[in-house]
């Protein structure tokens, strides 16, 4: 028996398509078999004893049973008898028909005779079998295979199953025909009933439609009448309203004309009153100006008398001025000669700096200090800067020695620097007592809200200004002070601390002579950015400029936890090579000291630059008289 045929047999038995067979499935398929036969078949096919027959178990067990019977030359009934020996029925087990010691060959004839008799007794009852089923060919093939398999019991049971199945199919066929006849009669009756209902519904719809149309006509007619009446009432009301509005408009026009006339009169009256007040005020001012003119006229008369007295004195001074102008011309000529000599000596200085030993042997000079050597080396690079300094220094303060050799004029810096800023000459920071001899450009820089503008106001006005607006761009201030007996003009450039103005600040750093870097001792973030500010200043300037680091708002240090300590600021200044001081713009502490320290540093740097180019500043104070001093002061 082939595998597809066995699979077809399994699918016929598995009507619910579960994939396995149970005892109940076999009982439904083979209702003619008793429980012993079903148990025998189920035990044969359930090889793993799981209580259900899988598809693979069914295929393998069925084919193995058929092949085993064919290989031993036994038919189906003989194989069943051989299996029954291993597991005999209850009535055979009770009678103990076979002896366990007997030979298997002696027992086989008895079993075969018993089964053959049982086969013939059951096959006689199923002589007439009808195989007219829907799958007749498959059933016939299966029937032939069962006949050839030599299992009469299965053949008889198969015949019974096919017979019962055919009988049930016949009954179902008759039942189906009966149901079809009933369905046809019911359908015909239903169609007649539906036709009657459709006719009734059509009649009802026609009546309802006619009634609705009539009601709609009546309603529309009534609404038209109501709308016509309402429109006539509204038209009459609108005519009345128009008449009232026209009357009110005329009344308003008359009222507006009257009000406009009154307004014109009031405006004219106001203009006249204002003109009258202006005339009175002008009259009072004229009286006041007249009195002031009279007093000024008297003062002018007094001044005229004084000027006449001074004129005679100035005539005497004119001769002195002529002599002084002649001396100035001589000094200018000397300066021109000195400048020419400086140009000539700059070339020799470059060679001298490269061969320091030869210069020292030539002039028998002692070894200069590192600071002086660096200043002399920078003098060559900053010659153009030094020539500009000549213009800012008063002419009477510049002296040249005609009898001194050129080399002694240039290399006299060591001796002149020894006398610079001696303790006896330091006089502090005071108000200026004359015109400025020097001018320094100082840039105020630092983060926003650290007190730069308050610092500047304390320097300029000597007072603290509260609630200053934020600086936008740059604010310029000028303060002339007297430092150690010299009048110095300090140009303070107050720059904005916001990040967006940083590029603008860099352009002012390039032209600055010094810088005041301010941080807030109560704001650690502003202190942390000090290093960046110093690097920005050094990158923006072409030469090294004096810088002072100022820690502002020390008056708030006690009330603010986590403020920057003074030692931290001093350490930062020492590491960056700048000056350091803590101040308070509120009470003015150390403001003047900070400005004094920076100004002295600026003056010292400028003195070194000037001396390195061969020009010596004369500390003598200018004479009070003279045309040149007056022109310089103006």
Curated annotation (Swiss-Prot):
GO cellular component term of the entry, any: perinuclear region of cytoplasm
Classification via Gene3D superfamilies: EF-hand, P-loop containing nucleotide triphosphate hydrolases
Source taxon at top rank: Eukaryota
Keywords linked to the UniProt accession: Calcium, Coiled coil, Cytoplasm, GTP-binding, Metal-binding, Nucleotide-binding, Repeat
CDD domains hit by this protein: Rab (cd00154)
Phenotype of gene-disrupted mutants: RNAi-mediated knockdown results in defective uterine seam (utse) cell nuclear migration, defective utse cell outgrowth and irregular uterine lumen formation.
Protein's recorded name: Ras and EF-hand domain-containing protein homolog
Gene: rsef-1
């Amino acid at each position: 028996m082939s595998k597809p045929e066995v699979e077809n047999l399994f699918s016929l038995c598995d009507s619910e398509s579960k994939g396995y067979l149970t005892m109940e499935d076999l009982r439904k398929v083979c209702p003619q078999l008793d429980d012993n036969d079903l148990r025998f078949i189920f035990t044969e096919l359930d090889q793993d004893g799981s209580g259900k027959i899988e598809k693979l178990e069914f295929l393998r067990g069925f084919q193995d049973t058929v092949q085993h019977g064919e290989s031993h030359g036994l038919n189906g009934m003989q194989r069943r008898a051989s299996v029954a020996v291993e597991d005999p029925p209850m009535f055979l087990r009770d009678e103990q028909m076979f002896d366990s010691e007997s030979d298997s060959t002696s027992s086989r004839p008895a079993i075969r005779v018993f089964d053959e008799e049982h086969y013939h007794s059951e096959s006689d009852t199923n002589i007439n079998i009808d195989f007219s089923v829907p799958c007749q060919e498959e059933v016939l093939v299966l029937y032939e295979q069962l006949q050839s398999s030599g299992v009469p019991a299965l053949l008889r049971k198969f015949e019974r199953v096919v017979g019962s199945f055919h009988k049930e199919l016949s009954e179902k066929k008759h039942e189906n025909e009966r149901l079809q006849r009933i369905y046809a009669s019911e359908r015909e009756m239903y169609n007649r009933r539906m036709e009657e209902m459709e006719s009734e519904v059509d009649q009802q719809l026609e009546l309802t439609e006619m009634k609705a149309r009539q009601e709609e006509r009546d309603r529309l007619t009534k609404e038209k009448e109501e709308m016509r009446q309402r429109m006539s009432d509204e038209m009459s009301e609108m005519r009345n309203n128009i008449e009232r509005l026209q009357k009110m408009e005329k009344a308003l026009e008359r009222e507006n004309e009257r009000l406009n006339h009154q307004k014109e009169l009031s405006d004219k009256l106001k203009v006249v009153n204002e003109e009258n007040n202006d005339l009175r005020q002008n009259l009072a001012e004229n009286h006041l100006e007249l009195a002031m003119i009279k007093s000024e006229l008297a003062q002018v008369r007094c001044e005229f008398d004084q000027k006449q007295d001074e004129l005679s004195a100035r005539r005497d001074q004119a001769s002195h001025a002529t002599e002084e102008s002649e001396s100035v011309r001589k000094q200018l000529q000397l300066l021109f000669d000195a400048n020419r000599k400086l140009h000539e000596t700059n070339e020799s200085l470059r060679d001298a700096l490269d061969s320091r030993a030869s210069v020292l042997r030539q002039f028998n000079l002692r070894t200069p200090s590192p600071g002086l050597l660096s200043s002399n080396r920078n003098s060559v690079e900053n010659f153009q800067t030094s020539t500009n300094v000549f213009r800012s220094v008063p002419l009477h303060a510049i002296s040249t020695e005609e009898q001194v050799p050129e080399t002694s004029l240039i290399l006299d810096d060591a001796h002149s620097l020894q006398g610079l800023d001696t303790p006896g000459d330091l006089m502090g920071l005071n108000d200026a007592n004359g015109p400025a001899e020097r001018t320094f450009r100082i840039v105020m820089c630092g983060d926003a809200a650290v007190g730069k503008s308050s610092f500047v106001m304390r320097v300029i006005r000597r007072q603290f200004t509260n609630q200053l607006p934020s600086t936008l761009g740059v604010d310029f201030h000028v303060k002339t002070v007297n430092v150690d007996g010299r009048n110095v003009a300090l140009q303070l450039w107050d720059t904005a601390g916001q990040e967006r103005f940083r590029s603008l600040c860099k352009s002012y750093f390039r032209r600055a002579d010094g810088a005041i870097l301010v941080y807030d001792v109560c704001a650690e973030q502003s202190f942390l950015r000090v290093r960046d500010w110093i690097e920005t200043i050094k990158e923006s300037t072409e030469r090294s400029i004096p810088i002072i680091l100022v820690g502002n708002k020390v008056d708030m240090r006690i009330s603010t936890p986590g403020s920057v300590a003074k030692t931290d600021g001093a350490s930062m200044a020492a590491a960056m090579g700048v000056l350091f001081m803590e101040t308070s713009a509120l009470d003015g502490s150390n403001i003047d000291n900070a400005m004094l320290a920076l100004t002295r540093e600026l003056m010292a740097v400028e003195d070194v630059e000037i001396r390195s180019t061969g020009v010596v500043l004369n500390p003598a104070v200018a004479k009070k008289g003279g045309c040149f001093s007056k022109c310089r002061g103006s």
